[in-house]
Design a protein with these regions (language model features):
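N-terminal, polar/charged subdomain of small-to-medium soluble alpha/beta proteins
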Residues: 14-25, 115, 122-123, 142-144
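A structural "domain/chain start" motif
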Residues: 9-99, 231-291
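Short secondary-structure boundary motifs at beta->alpha junctions and helix caps
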Residues: 71-82, 164-225
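A short, structured loop/turn motif at beta-sheet edges
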Residues: 21-25, 127-132, 159-177
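Aromatic/basic-lined ligand-recognition segments
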Residues: 153-158
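Short beta-strand->alpha-helix linker/helix-N-cap micro-motif
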Residues: 102-119
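C-terminal motif of bacterial Sec signal peptides marking the signal peptidase cleavage site
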Residues: 4-7
Length: 291
């Protein structure tokens, strides 16, 4: 999906225009979950870049990356046994039907599949749409951070009309809406095997509940993005808030406009134009945007 969208040279974020929204009477939701199991994100080595690049540097990086993957898989071995029956695809399929049942646009059909998309499949799906219906694509990828402390889900979401109906957003090969949604769980433990032990305790109760929460939050962000009346935008003068974000190696900072905030989680439109659902405890500072 990333390659498919990247080939179109599209911006990270395309807001749904009111004109396009007014034409939509129903959605055909198509969820692509290619993965069969959770993986751990592996930090990319940077020896090659530090040494000036070249073949030798690339070979060193490849060797380090392979070693990290093996170490990660070995650490996850016993954890996989506990979550063997976890089916993210099934969980998403059940959740999307209930979560979107009361959405303001009727969801006519829901398809959840492991089959990856290409342009031919996308065109076929679009051409099957009846009048007034739009195709909502959701393509989630889920993982544990490299230190095993967080469960992350990054989803590419886009909405398409029939291929013979050019959109006002830029033509027939461009979606009428696009966004990248990122969920990060509360941090668990101090990292490594100790964090995996917590995730796996009590038949992986915490992991299972966090997985379901990630799906609910992803759908919540998707619905916010499709509501043209509340389309978030990072404008100067809006209140900016700073949040901690674990990338698996270090804790970095994300800064942006708070779109929605609750007791436990906040949805943030960050400067990279991704929409994030982050735990409230990761909020570290609030500052006014530059005047």
């Amino acid at each position: 999906m990333a390659l498919l969208l990247g080939a179109c040279a599209m911006p990270m974020r395309i807001g749904l225009e009111p004109e396009e929204r007014s034409k939509i009477t129903a959605l055909a939701a198509h969820v692509v979950v290619v993965q069969d199991e959770v993986i751990a994100a592996v930090q990319a080595p940077t020896v090659g870049a530090a040494s000036g690049g070249g073949l030798i540097g690339a070979m060193i990086d490849a060797s380090i990356a392979n070693s990290r993957v093996k170490e990660s898989q070995q650490a996850l071995g016993s954890f996989y046994t506990v979550i063997e029956d976890v089916d993210y695809r099934k969980e998403f399929n059940e959740a999307i039907r209930s979560e979107l049942a009361n959405y303001q646009i009727k969801v006519a059909t829901v398809t959840t599949t492991p089959r990856a998309l290409n342009m031919d499949i996308l065109t076929k799906l679009r051409n099957q749409l009846p009048s007034g219906q739009a195709l909502l694509l959701i393509y989630p990828r889920y993982s544990l951070t490299a230190d095993f402390r967080n469960f992350d889900v990054e989803s590419q979401v886009s909405m398409w009309t029939r291929s013979d109906s050019p959109s006002s957003s830029g033509g027939m090969n461009r979606p009428i809406q696009r966004s990248v949604l990122y969920f990060q769980s509360q941090s668990v433990g101090m990292g490594g095997r100790k964090s995996l032990d917590i995730w796996g305790a009590d038949n992986a109760a915490l992991f299972r509940s966090t997985l379901r929460e990630s799906i609910t939050e992803t759908l919540r962000m998707a619905m916010i993005d499709l509501d043209v009346a509340t389309e978030p935008s990072a404008k100067a003068g809006n209140l900016q808030e700073e949040f901690s974000f674990n990338n698996g190696a270090i804790t970095t900072k994300l800064k942006g406009q708070v779109v929605k905030s609750g007791d436990t989680r906040t949805i943030l439109l960050a400067s990279d134009q991704k929409l994030y659902s982050l735990p409230r405890t990761s909020a570290s500072a609030s500052t006014a945007a530059a005047k």
